[in-house]
Amino acid sequence: MGRSLATTLFVLVLGLGFAADDLSAQTLPSRAAPGAVFLSERAMAHILARHGPESHAAGAGKFAPGMTTPDIRALIAEAVHAGIRRADTDGRPDALYDDRFARPIGTTIQGRPTPRLRVVVAPDGAVITAYPR
């Protein structure tokens, strides 16, 4: 299976790699994570359903109108690679990656424009969710 143009551009722009022939789980580089971080199609589906530009879910930050799935994947990859990593709260074993971009990427729960993104990563390296905050 060949890479799509969007995938090729994504790899060239951010210098990221994908599993050989499987784009269902995208490996993301992280300078802070002890192991590989990956974004599954299931996690991406959750992110789009709850936080995507078309989502009507209440009580959730949303990505900006017009953002595509590749755009959101690129933001997540950048946050995991360059964001600040810290432990999750209340004893949860997950890691939180917080990053601030040069422009608004979406809206907060309150509906205000925000340049900030949080990515939640499980101990096994699986991205659980990502949302503007």
Which sequence ranges carry the predicted segments?
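Functional cores of ribonucleases/endoribonucleases
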Residues: 28-133
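Positively charged n-region of N-terminal signal peptides that target proteins for export
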Residues: 1-4
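Bacterial N-terminal signal peptides
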Residues: 7-17
